[in-house]
Each structure stands twice: as C-alpha cells, then as structure tokens.
Amino acid sequence: MLLTIIALKSCGNENNAPKFKIKANQKTFVSGDTLHLSIQNKNKTAYDSVQFSLRGARINPTYVFPEDALLGDIPTEAVVFIEGKEFRTTTNVRLLNIKAPSLYTYTLVNEYPHDKQAYTQGLEFDGERLYESTGLRGKSSLRRVNFKTGAVEKQIDLDGTYFGEGLTLINGKIIQLTWQENIGFIYDQESMAMKSSFTYEQSKEGWGLCNDGTVLYKSDGSAKIWTLDATTQKEVSYIEATTNKTIITKINELEWVNGAIYANTYQSQKDVVLIINPKNGAVDGIIDFDGLRSKVEQIEGLDVLNGIAYHPGRKTFFVTGKN
C-alpha cells in the first residue's frame, strides 16, 4: 500500500529530478506490529542509501511499534542520498488503538435551568462555582454562573470581533480560547479581569480546553489535542484521538477527569463523549448520551451537545449544549 506525499529537494531541473515514494507493508498498524519501509523509485534512479524517520526520530527500515507509541497519523520521512545530494519524501503511517473502546451509558440524576441563549463552548467547576464560555460573534462572553438557579453572577462580554470557545481554570487564572481569531485570553479568576493574551502556533483554531493541574490540553477542530505549557501557553506536542478503526476529528469541548480527557465531538451523528488517554490519544471509552437532547425544551435553534463540567464532590457530570 502506497501512502505518499512527495516533497523533493534537488539542484537540477525538477522534471528530471528523481521521484521517490515511501512504501509501507500495511495500510494501518497497531502496537506490536512490524513496519517495513522501502522506497519506490519511479524513475529507477540508482541511489546510494536511504534514511527513514518517524516523528523526526531516525528508525531502521524494519521497526516494531512499542506499546506506548503515540497513535494516529505518524509523520514519516525518507531521505534518499545520491552522489552527495539529498532527496526527501514524506507520508503518514497510521497507528490505531489495539482495542475497541468500552461503551457506557448514563443515569440522569438532576436537571438545572440554563440560559437558552447561551451558545455554550466551555464549562468548568471550581468548587460550587460554575464558569462558562459562550460563543458567536457579538454574543461571546465569559460567565460565572449559579448552577442551581441558572443565574449569571458575573459576565464579561468579548469584543464583537471574537467568537468565544473553550475555557479552563488553572493557578488562579481563567484561560479562554477564541475560534478563528488566533488568540486566547487570560483572566484573574476571582475578579474576572482580563490580564493578558497569547497567540496560537501550529494549531490555527481554538475549540476546547482543559488542564491536568500542570499542563493545558487544547483542541483545534481536528483530531489533534495539543499540549501547552501552562505558564507560556506555548505548544509542546499533540496527540490524536484514535480508536481501533479510525481517527476521530472535530474534537471539541474538553474536560479533565481522573487522568483522562473527556471530549465532545462537534456535529457528530450521535450525542457522545469520548474518553481519551492523554498519553497516546487512545479512545478508551465512549459515553452514549442518546435521548438526552429530547429531555430539554425543544426551542428554535436547539444545537448540538456541548459543555462538560465534572463535579468532583458529587462525582457527576453536568452537560449542556449550544443554545
């Protein structure tokens, strides 16, 4: 099976340049599988040697995927050497989870009022205080909410140019994302006064956000969940949400619960929450919230399930949706 994106570097005429492709022995792999890489040489050009790498780390042409390998589409590169010149070609090798996710259902234990106009993007508890980020340009806000009554205790409205997205609380600060504006905001948690901002790097959009007490986890609408330094907000690495069959895209709102990332998926065919291993991206579980949407008032503009807030004291999840 050929998985190929060609990127060549040469000094001569590109039409006459050697054309190489990376060939893998399988379409997909799981941990423990053996990867065999070789070069397909379209022009049958003689070459001196070839060097392979996965995620920038050099490997032998025969490589066994370790148990703790990062899942998803692995950037793979070959450097072909011909008479002192280098020719590069890249592709992705897909590594899937070795086991299927566990399936869970839910028990509804209570209902609370919620602003029907709130286009909820982020939701997180600190004790009994519920913090919420809402979206849509001209309607985006940061809120502190009394979850029992639904009353908004304090609200900071964003400038109309911004589309609010996920939020998280860490070290006395609130960090809030925007969607396509390439900027995140940092607030003092108690006063909710804005203190500073930061710009995105490789992740061009802001979707969901959570933290484990040390680092931040940020989704960007793809399958990727980025790890960010909590102090500088710089991107460090990423994982990809991956099952035993596929890579799941449109990862949205995030919540950190007992060592795992719980995630909504935007515009999914089903109202589900994924349970993701933050170490390698494995989707270890899926919570099916089927039927939950029918239990709320069927207002005009009722949108998708979004917003997960875990209450550690009650050991329950508070979930809502956009509008």
Q: Positions of the model-derived regions?
A:
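Surface-exposed, short loops/turns at beta-strand junctions within beta-sandwich domains
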Residues: 65-73
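Beta-rich, blade/repeat-based domains predominating
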Residues: 116-127, 160-171, 201-213, 246-259, ...
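A short beta-strand motif characteristic of beta-propeller blades
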Residues: 107-113, 151-157, 193-199, 237-246, ...
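Short loop/turn segments that connect beta-strands within beta-propeller blades
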Residues: 145-150, 188-192, 230-233, 277-281
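A short helix->beta-strand "capping" segment at the edge of beta-propeller domains
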Residues: 96-117, 147-153
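Blade-loop segments of beta-propeller domains
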Residues: 150-187, 192-203
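Conserved beta-strand positions in repeat-built beta-propeller and related beta-rich domains
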Residues: 132-137, 176-181, 218-222, 263-268, ...
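C-terminal motif of bacterial Sec signal peptides marking the signal peptidase cleavage site
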Residues: 8-10
